[in-house]
Amino acid sequence: MPRIPGVNHQDAVRALRKAGFQIIRQGKHIVMSDGTRQVTIPRHNPIKAVTMGGIARDAGLTPEEFRKLL
């Protein structure tokens, strides 16, 4: 699994917005969608590296593409 260490949940939301995702709902987790894919971001800091890698993969991004969006 790709690793993207030390990412704040707010930075992750900002990066996914740049990738075309919109917030669907918020609570203890933030659910975002681009119309075809849906990702869930936990609302704690920092997000674990393995978890963030999985979120990037679910969003259809490589770790390098995600880092560029940060």
Where are these regions (language model features)?
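Ribonuclease/tRNase effector modules and their secretory precursors
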Residues: 1, 19, 38-39, 63-70
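Polyanion-binding surface elements
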Residues: 2-19
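C-terminal structural segments of small proteins and small subunits
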Residues: 8-11, 44-70
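A short, structured beta-strand/loop element
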Residues: 18, 22-53, 57-58
